[in-house]
Curated annotation (Swiss-Prot):
UniProt entry tagged with the keyword Lyase: yes
Gene (name only): mtnB
Pfam family for this entry, one: Aldolase_II
InterPro entries, per the entry: Aldolase_II/adducin_N, Aldolase_II/adducin_N_sf, MethylthioRu-1-P_deHdtase_MtnB
GO-annotated molecular function: methylthioribulose 1-phosphate dehydratase activity; zinc ion binding
Top-level taxon in the UniProt lineage: Bacteria
Broad EC category: lyase
Quaternary assembly: Homotetramer.
Name recorded for this polypeptide: Methylthioribulose-1-phosphate dehydratase
Organism: Geobacillus sp. (strain WCH70)
């Protein structure tokens, strides 16, 4: 099995798992996985595809500029430049971007603060943080319509081989050293978002102690 085929199957499996969670509303979201380092190439989801379905045109191979390596009628996902920034600046092997209701709500609630922090949740250990009173933060950036501008702002927060950024009223982009790590981190962040949204709703309908995220 060639490396390209292996990576394709890895990304297809992740796409199927995330689709089963209904995280690809209205063809939104984009996924990528690195294939080679030198030259840099990676598979990225094709634009406008229904990600609940599996086809032979789900992904295309692009270069370090986000352009298709071969002639194709397919177009890379709109936010491919964000994936480019990740692979250029880090040793990450996979990047996942999804639009969920919970991550959009959280990004709007805390968008003016530029970040949101969570503590006191066991799931934080998924990030390799084992301290009892650990706090984890995720930056929130504006949702610039001009993708090069968005990518430039996004790049300011790409500082390690694993990380995450929330784009306000848009979605979350998570990256990791490999596909397993990226998916694990995405699941952990979405758990935290969902927990906090539900906690806020409960506070509106019952007498509960005030707990900050």
């Amino acid at each position: 099995m060639s490396l390209l085929v292996k990576r394709w199957k890895e990304l297809a499996e992740i796409k199927a798992e995330l689709a089963a969670r209904d995280w690809f509303f209205a063809t939104s979201g984009n996924l990528s996985i690195k294939v080679t380092d030198d030259p840099l190439t990676f598979l990225v989801t094709a634009s406008g595809k229904d990600k609940r379905k599996q086809t032979d045109e789900d992904f295309l191979l692009v270069d370090a500029s986000g352009n298709p390596v071969e002639n194709t009628h397919l177009k890379p996902s709109a936010e491919t430049l964000l994936h480019v920034e990740i692979y250029k600046k880090t040793n990450a092997g996979c990047s996942l971007h999804v639009h969920t209701i919970d991550n959009n709500v959280i990004s709007e609630l805390y968008g003016d603060e530029g970040e949101v922090a969570f503590s006191g949740q066991e799931i934080i250990k998924a990030f390799g943080i084992w301290e009892e009173d650990a706090v984890i933060r995720i930056p929130i950036i504006p949702n610039y319509a001009h993708i090069p501008t968005l990518a430039k702002e996004f790049a300011k927060h790409v500082n390690g081989d694993a990380g995450a950024v929330l784009i306000r009223n848009h979605g979350i982009t998570v990256w990791g050293r490999d596909a397993f790590e990226a998916k694990k981190f995405l699941e952990a962040w979405e758990f935290l978002f969902s927990w906090h949204v539900k906690w806020l709703l409960l506070k509106q309908t019952a007498v509960l102690p005030v707990v900050k995220p």
